[in-house]
Every structure is written in C-alpha cells, then in structure tokens.
Amino acid sequence: MSDEINETCKPQACAIQNCLMKNGYNESKCSYYIDELYKCCKKFYESNGSSASSVCCPKFNLLQLKLKQRELGQIDANLIDTKHG
C-alpha cells in the first residue's frame, strides 16, 4: 500500500474553491463546478471501487447521497443573509 496522497479530481475541487471565493462563498452560484467534481468522483469510484480514497472526493456513500439529491433537483446550499440593519 502506498503512502502517496491521491489527488484525483483536484482540478475540479480547485475550481469549486475559486468559484466560492469569487462569489462570496455563495455555494448556490457554484453548482456547475460541484456537479463536475461529483461526476469526476463518480468515475473515480467506478474505476477504483467504493473503498478507494481521494482527498478531493467525498466518501463513496456520501457521494451516492449527493448524486441522488442532485438528480431530484434539491439545492445543496443557499446563502443565508444574516445581516440585520
């Protein structure tokens, strides 16, 4: 077993971070990039099995849940305005 860190899907994960920074961490504006990461991670698990691991991908069971939620059109997150004024 290798001690090497698996960074499969790193470009997609970095794209999410860049999008979040550009959009004030409003996750709903970065759905495209989140979907791209999930697609990449799905391919990763299909090729390597459900016990595989990448620091850029959610665990297999969580990815399955997220993919199912997105198929149903559920939104991952909304920015809640907590400013009072």
Curated annotation (Swiss-Prot):
Residues 6-48 form the CHCH domain. Keywords: Disulfide bond, Mitochondrion, Repeat. InterPro entries: CMC4, Cys_alpha_HP_mot_SF. It holds the Pfam family CMC4. A motif (Cx9C motif 1) lies at residues 9-19. SUPFAM superfamilies: Cysteine alpha-hairpin motif. It is found in: Mitochondrion intermembrane space. Disulfide bonds join 9-40, 19-30. It comes from the Eukaryota. One of its GO terms (cellular component) is mitochondrial intermembrane space. Its main location: mitochondrion. PROSITE patterns: CHCH. A motif (Cx9C motif 2) lies at residues 30-40. The twin Cx9C motifs are involved in the recognition by the mitochondrial disulfide relay system. Belongs to the CMC4 family. This is Cx9C motif-containing protein 4, mitochondrial. The gene is CMC4.
